[in-house]
Curated annotation (Swiss-Prot):
GO BP terms in the entry: L-tryptophan biosynthetic process
Keywords per UniProt: Amino-acid biosynthesis, Aromatic amino acid biosynthesis, Lyase, Magnesium, Metal-binding, Tryptophan biosynthesis
Cited InterPro entries: ADC_synthase, Anth_synth_I-like, Anth_synth_I_N, Anthranilate_synth_I_arc_typ, Chorismate_C
Cofactor: how and how many bound: Binds 1 Mg(2+) ion per subunit.
Family from the record: Belongs to the anthranilate synthase component I family.
Quaternary structure, from the entry: Heterotetramer consisting of two non-identical subunits: a beta subunit (TrpG) and a large alpha subunit (TrpE).
Residues bound to Mg(2+): 298, 435
Protein's name according to its UniProt entry: Anthranilate synthase component 1
The organism of origin for this protein: Methanothermobacter thermautotrophicus (strain ATCC 29096 / DSM 1053 / JCM 10044 / NBRC 100330 / Delta H) (Methanobacterium thermoautotrophicum)
Record-listed L-tryptophan binding positions: 41, 236-238
Residues holding chorismate: 271-272, 386, 406, 420-422
Amino acid sequence: MNVFGITELKNPVKEKIEFKEPFELFKSIYSEYDSSFLLESMESDTGLARYSFMGFEPQMIIRARSGFIEVEYEGSREEFDTENPFEFLRQFTRPAGKSRGFCGGLVGYISYQAARFFDSINLSPGNFPDFEFGLFLDGIMFNHLTGECSYISLKENRLPEISELLREETPTGHLKYRSMGTLFSRRRYLGMVEEARERIAEGEIFQAVLSNATDYRLRGDRLALYEALRRVNPSPYMYHLKLGSREITGSSPEMLVRVEDKQIETFPIAGTRPRGKTPHEDERIAAELLSDEKELAEHLMLVDLARNDLGRISEFGTVQVPEYMTIRRFSHVQHILSHVTGRLRKGMDALDALGAVFPAGTVSGAPKIRAMEIIESLEGVPRNAYAGALGYLSLNGNADFAITIRSMVAEGAYGRIQAGAGIVHDSVPEREYVECQNKAMAVLKSMELAGDGFDSDEPFIARR
């Protein structure tokens, strides 16, 4: 299958449009179409927040499952056998033009389990696809540096539909939810931490990131959670992705990888503390974080891992660390952050860059492959979209992906919020358990703001 032959792509058409507040427009799009996305930047740091994009009704949807690719196109569905589904995607990432950012292409998510296609590792397939992308050939782009809003189209011009939606007002929805309990009890999670520490003491690994999750039964408007999350935890990577029955809502602080005009960058985050109640307390907590030898050692380890990952696909001598161990603050937590860059080697593309860093060391551990094997044995449940990546592969060869954390992953009437903590030799199990709770706090607070709980006599069965 050749996407360029099927879609008969034109040169990009770009038209400036007057717009209301971006999210207000997206509410109308979300309620009108079965599949849509909003990739939004809500951070003053322009190094992380340059553009916001939204799109609707993709040309096709592509899903990867064990052994085959599934393509939905113009009302039909086809399946193709494949050993590595990511090779199928290369036809969509052929560089075409010099435009910056996203100019149409694949928008979607990659599940954590897809790491088995990038490295020799035995991970059990999850109940989510290994990846799921919509091919979006038009959409709306917001440039936060210039304040401009543009409609971009590579095929059919659907600007009249957008113009109609601009005149509509869609009321805020309401979400109802009921907790189905956590994936691991406190006692079991503490035991997992102890076992990971034993593996570290035996020299198998230096670090492993162990996660816990809370499952929910959902009713009502999933977008209400995103609207609340925008207020509670504005972040450089805000997203709401709806592809049929699956929706992912999140506010990730962490870039997995960005490729733009052959330049590669990533921002490893490791080292976490809660926010203070006052600016003075914030500074005190940050100073304590930056003097914590355990946190500093963990961060250094993950910066080195990021440097090694980029080194696999970068021109010799181009990998640099222009920003090292700075504090980045969000609504409920503050982190230590570094910036690692490189220049893509000749013959490599955005998929090579994605494969080199996936999954992030900050959600797996070091050495990465052995850490993932230990995580698989201890957690025993596929992570699915959590700790994978969400973003775009643009038809101009660019890519931008966030790590799928600080998110609700929903399918049908069920949703899951998951968060992890990095375990090292000096970890205190109770403290790591609390760190998982702190990292999930922004999404949990947003759930409370977006709606309320409901009671039901209906039995609930967790998807395990």
